[in-house]
UniProtKB/Swiss-Prot annotation:
InterPro entries named among the record's database cross-references: DNA_bind_recomb_sf, DNA_bind_recombinase_dom, SSR_resolvase, Zn_ribbon_recom_dom
Stated name of the protein: Uncharacterized protein YefB
Composition bias type Polar residues, residue spans: 1-11
GO MF annotation list: DNA binding; DNA strand exchange activity
Gene3D superfamilies from the UniProt entry: Putative Large Serine Recombinase, Chain B, Domain 2 (3.90.1750.20)
Gene name of the record: yefB
Chain intervals for the UniProt region annotation (Disordered): 1-20
Pfam families for the chain: Recombinase, Zn_ribbon_recom
Alphabetic keyword roster: Coiled coil, DNA-binding
Domain of life (superkingdom): Bacteria
Coiled-coil region: 162-249
Source species taxonomy: Bacteria, Bacillati, Bacillota, Bacilli, Bacillales
Organism (species): Bacillus subtilis (strain 168)
DNA-binding region: 1-92
Length: 300
């Protein structure tokens, strides 16, 4: 129904978080609703309290049921056949099998988690798996390839960590960038304060009749834009400054990496200690974001 462009129930109800996608639970509720057979069935659910948002089901004997209360859309016989089919298809969900990259691998394009497909021995985009090509492409990557790439990358990082003076170089690089960012923050703060003074002077000039309203409006718009740009730059610089505080991050990552090299096995627990996220592109290539970050050049 999503692929055919049929309006979803949430869109029809104009909900704030409405989506164009149909979900299995919505379809099931429609199939199980006797209202379409001409039967009025009321008091099917209730709320335990006025403050509760959760609904609970009411036993059938306590519901109000009025048959042939309105014109049916579907015959009762068809409805009963559907109920029998639903019962035969109903099955207990097996305990969810945890795969190595569950909750770690994500689709680069739609940001949904990758789902493991046993028949393909790999992962596909969650949006594609649930809603098809209209939602996203499959972004398929095999579990073996993904494991090999992660292990290869971890081995490269381990060799880098093993180099003499590597930690010292990282600390010096972080300190260098930190000082550069702090200097830039002081510079931008001075410019921001100058612009705020200019804004105050414009207000005084307008009040004293030194400038016209038109000139004031033109000047104040430019000044406000400059102030906004400086504030945005300061916010980004503050984030960059926080990014340089990596010493503890490096130590924790190194401990986990040493443990992995000693054990030689990539388990889900070990993966989550080392890897923050794996982004899978449409062509199957990957980007690995580790829980360790090298100091980076300031963005501003």
């Amino acid at each position: 129904m999503y692929n055919e462009g049929v309006t979803s129930p949430s869109q029809l109800a104009r909900k704030k978080n409405a989506t164009d996608k149909w979900h299995g639970s919505s379809i099931r509720k429609i199939l199980e609703n006797p209202h379409y057979t001409g039967t009025l069935q009321q008091c099917r659910e209730y709320r335990p309290s006025v403050t509760s948002k959760r609904r609970r089901s009411v036993n059938l004997e306590n519901q109000i049921i009025i048959e042939k209360s309105h014109e049916p859309i579907i015959p009762l016989e068809d409805f009963l056949i559907v109920q029998e089919i639903l019962i035969t298809r109903k099955r207990r969900r097996p305990q969810a099998e945890v795969h190595l990259f569950t909750n770690t691998a994500v689709c680069k394009d739609c940001r949904r988690s990758m789902h493991f497909k046993k028949n393909r021995k790999g992962y596909v985009c969650g949006s594609y798996n649930k809603h098809g090509l209209k939602a996203c492409s499959d972004h398929y990557v095999s579990e073996i390839d993904l494991t090999d790439k992660v292990i290869t990358n971890l081995n490269k990082i381990y060799l880098k960590f093993s180099k003499e003076n590597y930690f010292k170089e990282l600390s010096e690089k972080a300190l260098k960038y930190k000082e550069k960012i702090e200097s830039k923050i002081i510079e931008i703060n001075e410019k921001l304060n100058d612009k705020k003074r200019d804004k105050s002077n414009l207000v005084i000039s307008l009040a004293n009749g030194v400038i016209s309203k038109e000139d004031y409006q033109l000047a104040i718009n430019i000044t406000n834009e400059d102030i906004s740009n400086f504030e945005t730059t300061l916010h980004q610089l503050s984030k960059d400054l926080e990014f340089q505080k990596i010493e503890k991050e490096i130590i924790d990552f190194k401990k986990s990496l040493d443990k992995f090299m000693k054990e030689g096995t990539l388990t889900p627990e070990m993966l989550h200690l080392l890897v923050d996220e794996i982004e899978v592109h449409a062509n199957g290539t990957i980007e690995i974001n580790y829980r360790f970050r090298e100091p980076t050049v300031p963005s501003a």
